[in-house]
Design a protein with these regions (language model features):
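Sequence contexts marking disulfide-bonded cysteines in secreted/extracellular proteins
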Residues: 84-86, 145-147, 167-169, 173-175
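Intrinsically disordered, low-complexity polar segments enriched in Ser/Thr/Pro and acidic
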Residues: 30-32, 122-128, 132-137, 206, ...
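Secretory pathway targeting signatures of secreted, lumenal, and periplasmic proteins
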Residues: 37-97, 127-137
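Ser/Thr/Pro/Gly-rich low-complexity linker/stalk segments immediately outside membranes or between
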Residues: 27-41
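Surface-exposed amphipathic alpha-helical segments
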Residues: 49, 53-54, 153-231
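Hydrophobic beta-strand residues in large extracellular and virion-surface proteins
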Residues: 41, 46-50, 70-72, 79-85, ...
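Secretory targeting signatures
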Residues: 1-30
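Signature of long, low-cysteine stretches enriched in small and polar/charged residues
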Residues: 61-64, 92-152
Length: 231
């Protein structure tokens, strides 16, 4: 694999896959105060505590990913927490950044650095015209991606909140983050993940193909590769 064009094609295909996955999962939110109840969770790769009454969602895992993803919802406050543990999983957020996702904030909780990304989305099934009335703001989904990289493995919590039930300005100082996301991330206890699936396998790539694409994405992000000069 010696053509940079191959990398661009692979990234373009991956972007479509990522967008599709995001569209499937981006349909829930939360909002509660610190006096509400809390809910403990414990899965194959991490454990911790949510603020509020949260239930586990059923996931139809297939193949090597089975047990390495998890999902929870706070139905009272419209919130979804999607979790995953994948080797080289930071490749996904790197590609997100190529698509325009802003650089992450970095926070240290219990000795572990977390990268915190923020973005927004609008569910297509709820909006027919993005230029319509002032109620449109209620359709905006606030998305926080919290990622901890440990020995080449990404532990990721994707939090989605909609209907503006909890104030959010996209920072780490708004009620949405301070009351719900921050406390959750701070509570996380990691588990050994030597058998976590590899991103290469999930994308249907050989190790060589994945390394080529990852190196290429890394090069664009760190400025050593100029994609505009691709021939």
């Amino acid at each position: 694999m010696d053509s940079k064009k191959t990398a661009i094609i692979a990234i373009a295909v991956l972007a479509i896959v990522i967008s599709s996955l995001g569209a499937v999962s981006a349909f829930e939110l939360f909002g509660m105060n610190l006096f509400d109840s809390s809910t403990d969770f414990d899965n194959k790769f991490m454990s911790g505590t949510f603020n509020g009454e949260v239930i586990q969602n059923e996931i139809k895992d297939n193949g090597s990913i089975k047990g390495w993803t998890d999902s929870y919802s706070d139905n009272e406050n419209n919130i979804t927490y999607n979790m995953s543990c994948v080797k080289d999983g930071d490749f996904i957020t790197d590609v997100y950044q190529l698509q325009g996702l802003g650089a992450p904030e970095v926070r240290n909780y219990n000795g572990q650095a977390w990268k915190i990304f923020y973005s927004q989305a609008v569910p297509d099934n709820n909006v027919t015209d993005n230029k319509t009335s002032g109620n449109d703001t209620n359709n905006t989904i606030n998305v926080y991606i919290c990622e901890a990289d440990i020995n080449g493995t990404a532990y990721t919590i994707n939090v989605m909140s909609y209907e503006n039930k909890t104030e959010c300005d996209g920072t780490l100082f708004c009620p949405l983050y301070k009351e719900y996301i921050g406390p959750l991330v701070e509570s996380i206890q990691f588990k050994e993940a030597k058998k976590a699936p590899k991103m290469a396998d999930l994308l249907g790539m050989s190790d060589e193909e994945f390394k080529f694409n990852k190196d290429y994405v890394d090069g664009i992000l760190n400025g050593t590769i100029d994609p505009s000069k691709l021939q």
